């Protein structure tokens, strides 16, 4: 049975955009409660939509979710509200943009105690680009430290709206939430009625079910989808059979038909989530649409790191764990690699730093694999003297200096929101990290947005931690990739007794190479245990050594048994010891402890 245009008019598709910790998931809980989708007794835990422990602990949303609520409005009619919960972090901005494309409106949540933050602005711009109607909401108004009017002025300046259009709520206490639901019905437009057109549905997320394969979340933009239809995916051109379709409340609810405006799920025995890419378009194989919905792009990893099991026997466990994680996360790439120092492991590609941390934490937590991580690095584009272009994502694979014409590295544009008091500290940090300052805009009398351009390699390390510490926790940042630029980059190798340790190689800017080499040698000197012979730690660019530290040998007192006697006897014993140490040095290998690899991650401490 087809939906009448009247029923389409009673659908509202919306999402919630907010900075981390501004109360997005708590507000979603209140909406579920007021619409009786869940009652309080079923809410065993707060943040119902954040179903990973990691999501709850960090207070972030990692995966997109969709949930359908029924609500009887003040006009007496029943409305279908589809809430599409989006990740808030910059690493997942493409997923956010696809989730926004599945909506007609967005709730912009701003914390009354914190004000507008960097990710609020970044996601707001994505929502405005998608043409969404925005309902601004100030949350946490019941806290003693809230500054509702000050934050309202920031929001008015940001999106140019009247004060009375901004709603005030306390998601935790439930204050103002009924008025917010009425505003969703009144102010967010209904989807267009496009049932007569060929099917085009937008995939905004997918999860993997061990028994059913990939479960695809989609928004029907045009046409309709019936159970049993043959469906085609534009990106892979593959055809599948729609075994089950339906809508998402707290659990999957099978239906026989989804129509334009609906948000639901599709199960069609897809064994690999890479066949159901976020942003792709689904159409009917028998009556296909001519072109896909706009906005699709292949997600490319930006940050790379080597993951190695601490115990080499766990290599297969690590492989299985990565395979399972990749089933749910199409943006995680991994390829096997070997290192002389660390043995067998994987070179993994991530969307950004948070993505990398989450994957590492899930490997240790959910799969019990203990891993060593090499220094995160970015993908360099190397133009050789013969004109060939080589992509390098592992510093140890960097070609010899003599064969390189130029090296290009990825750059990002960054917005930092902070209190005006910390501008000087942030400018200093920007200069340290080769940042290019652009300009500063004032949000109000105390808060500013600073605009920079940075090499991505300079911020993948500990930039966020440093930013938080120099601004006493007040600064927030957001960045966006802008392209490659050529830079004077060199490969810095670490040698122990003349042997290169491949896992300690890094690519740095020439201006920083000496400083980095010196710090690294000193750090390793304190970590590598003394041997029976002298150990030379050297940092080198090509064949040129730029820094050196020496670990002196452990010395046994061979003269202890000579209480007096002839000096030549003592000399003979010392010469014999010297010869033995020389021989040891030739055959001995310096064992590099695991702490040495971790030392690279906190070189400045």
From Swiss-Prot:
Stated membrane topology is: Peripheral membrane protein
Q: Which PROSITE patterns match?
A: G_TR_2 (PS51722)
tr-type G domain ranges (all copies) = 9-192
Which GO biological-process labels does this protein carry? positive regulation of translation
> What enzyme class is recorded for this protein?
hydrolase
The residues that hold GTP are 21-26, 139-142
Compartments it resides in: Cell inner membrane
Q: Which reaction does it catalyse?
A: GTP + H2O = GDP + phosphate + H(+)
Q: What does this protein do?
A: Required for accurate and efficient protein synthesis under certain stress conditions. May act as a fidelity factor of the translation reaction, by catalyzing a one-codon backward translocation of tRNAs on improperly translocated ribosomes. Back-translocation proceeds from a post-translocation (POST) complex to a pre-translocation (PRE) complex, thus giving elongation factor G a second chance to translocate the tRNAs correctly. Binds to ribosomes in a GTP-dependent manner.
* InterPro entries, alphabetized: EF-4 (IPR006297), EFG_III/V (IPR035647), EFG_V-like (IPR000640), EFTu-like_2 (IPR004161), LepA_C_sf (IPR038363), LepA_CTD (IPR013842), LepA_IV (IPR035654), P-loop_NTPase (IPR027417)
Q: Which PANTHER family match?
A: TRANSLATION FACTOR GUF1 HOMOLOG, CHLOROPLASTIC, TRANSLATION FACTOR GUF1-RELATED
For this protein, the record's Pfam families field holds:
EFG_C (PF00679), GTP_EFTU (PF00009), GTP_EFTU_D2 (PF03144), LepA_C (PF06421)
GO MF, any single term: ribosome binding
List the Gene3D superfamilies.
3.30.70.240, Elongation factor 4, C-terminal domain, Elongation Factor G (Translational Gtpase), domain 3, P-loop containing nucleotide triphosphate hydrolases, Translation factors
Major site of localization recorded for this protein: membrane
**Gene Ontology cellular component list:** plasma membrane
UniProt-recorded name of the protein: Elongation factor 4
Instruction: State the similarity comment.
Output: Belongs to the TRAFAC class translation factor GTPase superfamily. Classic translation factor GTPase family. LepA subfamily.
* Record EC number: 3.6.5.n1
Q: Which UniProt keywords apply?
A: Cell inner membrane, Cell membrane, GTP-binding, Hydrolase, Membrane, Nucleotide-binding, Protein biosynthesis
């Amino acid at each position: 049975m087809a939906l009448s245009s009247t029923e389409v008019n009673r659908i509202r598709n919306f999402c919630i955009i907010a900075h981390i910790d501004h109360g997005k998931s708590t507000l979603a809980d209140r909406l579920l409660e007021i619409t009786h989708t869940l009652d309080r007794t079923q809410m065993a835990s707060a943040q119902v939509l954040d179903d990973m422990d990691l999501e709850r602990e960090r207070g972030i949303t990692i995966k997109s979710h969709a949930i359908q609520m029924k609500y009887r409005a003040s006009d007496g009619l029943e409305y279908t509200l589809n809430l599409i919960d989006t990740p808030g972090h910059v690493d997942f901005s493409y997923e956010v943009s696809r989730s926004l494309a599945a909506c007609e409106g967005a709730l912009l949540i701003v914390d009354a105690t914190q004000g507008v933050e960097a990710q609020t602005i970044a996601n707001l711009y994505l929502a405005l680009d998608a043409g969404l109607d925005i309902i601004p909401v100030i949350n946490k108004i019941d806290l003693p430290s809230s500054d509702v009017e000050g934050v309202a002025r920031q929001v008015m300046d940001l999106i140019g709206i009247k004060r009375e259009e901004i709603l005030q709520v306390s998601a935790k206490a439930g204050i103002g939430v009924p008025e917010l639901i009425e505003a969703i019905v009144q102010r967010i437009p209904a989807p267009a009625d496009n049932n007569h057109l060929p099917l085009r549905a937008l995939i905004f997320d997918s999860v993997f079910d061990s028994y059913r394969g990939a479960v695809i979340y989609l928004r029907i933009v045009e046409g309709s989808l019936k159970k049993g239809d043959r469906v085609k995916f534009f990106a892979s051109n593959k055809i599948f059979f729609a075994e089950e379709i339906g809508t998402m409340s707290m659990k999957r609810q099978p239906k026989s038909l989804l129509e334009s405006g609906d948000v639901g799920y599709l199960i069609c025995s897809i064994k690999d989530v890479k066949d159901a890419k976020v942003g792709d378009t689904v159409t009917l194989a028998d009556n296909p649409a001519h072109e896909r919905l706009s906005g699709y792009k292949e997600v490319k990893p930006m940050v790379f790191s080597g993951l190695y099991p601490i115990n080499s026997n766990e290599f297969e466990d690590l492989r299985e764990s990565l395979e399972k994680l990749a089933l749910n996360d199409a943006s995680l790439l991994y390829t096997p690699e070997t290192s002389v120092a660390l043995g067998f492991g994987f070179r993994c590609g991530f969307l950004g730093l948070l993505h990398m941390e989450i994957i590492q934490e899930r490997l240790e937590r959910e799969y019990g694999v203990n891993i060593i991580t090499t220094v995160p690095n970015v993908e360099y584009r190397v133009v050789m003297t013969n004109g060939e272009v080589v992509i390098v994502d592992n510093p140890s694979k960097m070609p010899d200096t003599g064969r390189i014409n130029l090296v290009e590295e990825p750059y990002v544009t960054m917005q930092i929101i902070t209190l005006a008091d910390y501008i000087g500290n942030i400018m200093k940090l920007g200069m340290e990290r080769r940042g290019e300052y652009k300009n500063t805009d004032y949000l109000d009398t105390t808060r500013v947005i600073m605009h920079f351009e940075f090499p991505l390699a300079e911020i993948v390390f500990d930039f966020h931690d440093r930013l938080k510490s120099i601004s006493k926790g007040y600064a927030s940042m957001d960045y966006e990739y802008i392209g490659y630029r050529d830079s004077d980059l060199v490969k810095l190798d670490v040698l122990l007794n003349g042997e290169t340790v491949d896992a300690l190689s890094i690519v740095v800017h020439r201006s920083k190479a000496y400083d980095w080499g010196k710090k690294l040698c000193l750090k390793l000197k304190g970590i590598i245990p003394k041997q029976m012979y002298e150990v030379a730690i050297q940092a080198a660019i090509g064949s040129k050594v730029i820094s050196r530290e020496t670990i002196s040998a452990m010395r046994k007192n061979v003269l202890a048994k000579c209480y007096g006697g002839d000096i030549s006897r003592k000399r003979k014993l010392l010469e014999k010891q010297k010869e033995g140490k020389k021989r040891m040095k030739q055959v001995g290998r310096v064992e590099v402890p695991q702490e040495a690899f971790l030392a690279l991650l906190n070189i400045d401490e």
